[in-house]
Amino acid sequence: MMVLIERESNFNPNAVNGWDSNAKGGDPSRGLCQVIMATFVWCKHPGAPNDIMNPLANICAAINWIKFKYGDIRFVQQANKNLPPKGY
């Protein structure tokens, strides 16, 4: 997760991506893991704060998304320091 967070937000919990396809579609990536609101709403942990910019809530939503989509973080290129960055 540390590699993914560094690549996605450079450890900035207030990071907002205002230029990619998600932003152009009205749902910018936000927070440490650069989660979009649609994913956050669907994947947030019920015990975590309901705030996409909250570091704990953002990371929990990202982990739930990774588990759903990839099964394991080992299959996420963006989280592998030996591979070039790639969105997840």
Which residues does each PLM region occupy?
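Peptidoglycan cell-wall recognition and remodeling modules
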Residues: 1-88
